[in-house]
Amino acid sequence: MISNFRVLGAGVWGLAFSDYLLKLGHNVEIFCRDTNLSTKDISGLKLSRVSEKNIMSLDTLNAQKSSGEINIIAVSSKGFSELLNKHESYFSTLNELVSLTKGLDHLSGKYFSDHVFDMFSNIKKYGLISGPSFAKDLCFEKKISVSFATLDTEFSKLMVEATKSSHFEMIPTTYIYQIEIAGIIKNIAAILCGMADKYFSKGIHSNMIIKKA
């Protein structure tokens, strides 16, 4: 069944997941600050379906009407709260929300799931997508699986069915906090890998950090 998605953010994962959804035949709108695809750092990705016709300015989000689209947050952890605050009127119209972003709110220290529920009583269903996985692997159709954490069984079934393919699957779970904690550890590991690659030869310590994380 064809679904309508809105991806809020156009980082590497946001673009890769949008491209994958388009390959499956879904309708996808991508909202971001910079709508020029050529300025984005996507040299390592193989985007076959995403084009600038799919991309809209994030400044127009508050003016958009919600018509049953599945909204997926795909901004950085630092930009999560900013997105919610700046576009509060839009999020106030939603019943469900999915996030590729994991971590803690930088101001309150709350889990992002708690932050969403505290801000928006209208959002009844919240889902979290988490690896471990790499955006480029999804683009190159390598076989990967990710977790989809939500407390709503029907929402879980909807996302699992809408995104499954021969090389990608979502594993449903209800352990939202545990997935968020794992995401925090993964973010810390990514920072450490970047530091290790900068100060030592690339890859020497990164693999060890990834395994320990």
Q: In which residue ranges do the predicted regions lie?
A:
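NAD(P)+-binding Rossmann beta1-loop-alpha1 motif at the extreme N-terminus of oxidoreductases
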Residues: 1-55, 60
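Flexible, glycine-rich phosphate/dinucleotide-binding loops
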Residues: 14, 37, 106, 135, ...
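Internal alpha-helical scaffold of NAD(P)-dependent oxidoreductase catalytic cores
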Residues: 27, 90, 115, 119-125, ...
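Short, charged/polar "capping" segments at the starts of alpha-helices
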Residues: 36-41, 106-108, 156
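Rossmann-like NAD(P)(H) cofactor-binding subdomain of soluble oxidoreductases
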Residues: 56, 63-143, 159
